[in-house]
Amino acid sequence: MTMKHDVKTFQGFILTLQEYWAQQGCAIVQPLDMEVGAGTFHPQTFLRSLGPEPMSSAYVQPSRRPTDGRYGENPNRLQHYYQFQVVLKPSPDNIQELYLGSLQALGIDTQVHDIRFVEDNWESPTLGAWGLGWEVWLNGMEVTQFTYFQQVGGIECSPVTGEITYGLERLAMYIQEVDSVYDLVWTDGPMGRVTYGDIFHQNEVEQSTYNFEHADVDFMFTLFDQCEKMCQHLLSLDKPLPLPAYEQVMKASHAFNLLDARHAISVTERQRYILRVRAMSKGVAESYYQAREALGFPLCK
């Protein structure tokens, strides 16, 4: 039974996207329970895009980018925000039509509004990943990123995975016609109206203060080294453990992002740290591929 959700609330907006993509055959999975900078880090995207096994999924992913914090003073810059990620493997021929259908489900008339696909190829140096892509502009504002993964963890993607990443806050601000993310209505029900600011404003103030002023630099350097060491250990076992090793990659990546926010890494060092994360990602990708291959790629029917 299809329920009609109020897309003029952030809650209803997310529920509508989930329901739409579920109807297209996606598994609606849950967010990763770790600090990541983007939905692409979720194993459902990074790891599942490797090898021949088909997989279509969709999920909300809380994302953290410490350097983007503004102490809750900027109406559209956040250090913690939400992405809605759709991963389609193999990428269907009608992926753009499916995306436009999701906008229609959100009440956006694609015949009336100016919707443009602007070429913007994507790259993630830390994940050793890149793809051909497009930004989707709605009346002159970027709201979504399309990517066709060509390579992940240094491994060629075959078949190609199609990824759609919605910027939830930005798209919701457009739908609700508000100028500040904190004015977004999260829900408006029997218990009263709750805004995005009611839930997250204090968090933005405090986390920005931590990210820029109090994150322990020495601890973060040590944490990065320890995560790298553990990742290498897990991959060197007689029976490697690529999934736990990948968690170490994500922890190291977040430690790096906090060091970046604290201005603790020089330009030269920054590149070296990116290459260290990339080397870990590549090792995980190769190990994961080999593990699935040893199982006979069980999702291939």
From Swiss-Prot:
<comment type="subunit">
    <text>Tetramer of two alpha and two beta subunits.</text>
</comment>
<keyword id="KW-0547">Nucleotide-binding</keyword>
<keyword id="KW-0963">Cytoplasm</keyword>
<comment type="similarity">
    <text>Belongs to the class-II aminoacyl-tRNA synthetase family.</text>
</comment>
<keyword id="KW-0436">Ligase</keyword>
<dbReference type="GO" id="GO:0004820">
    <property type="term" value="F:glycine-tRNA ligase activity"/>
</dbReference>
<dbReference type="InterPro" id="IPR006194">
    <property type="entry name" value="Gly-tRNA-synth_heterodimer"/>
</dbReference>
<dbReference type="GO" id="GO:0006426">
    <property type="term" value="P:glycyl-tRNA aminoacylation"/>
</dbReference>
<dbReference type="GO" id="GO:0005524">
    <property type="term" value="F:ATP binding"/>
</dbReference>
<dbReference type="InterPro" id="IPR045864">
    <property type="entry name" value="aa-tRNA-synth_II/BPL/LPL"/>
</dbReference>
<protein>
    <recommendedName>
        <fullName>Glycine--tRNA ligase alpha subunit</fullName>
        <ecNumber>6.1.1.14</ecNumber>
    </recommendedName>
</protein>
<dbReference type="InterPro" id="IPR002310">
    <property type="entry name" value="Gly-tRNA_ligase_asu"/>
</dbReference>
<keyword id="KW-0030">Aminoacyl-tRNA synthetase</keyword>
<dbReference type="GO" id="GO:0005829">
    <property type="term" value="C:cytosol"/>
</dbReference>
<keyword id="KW-0648">Protein biosynthesis</keyword>
<dbReference type="Pfam" id="PF02091">
    <property type="entry name" value="tRNA-synt_2e"/>
</dbReference>
<keyword id="KW-0067">ATP-binding</keyword>
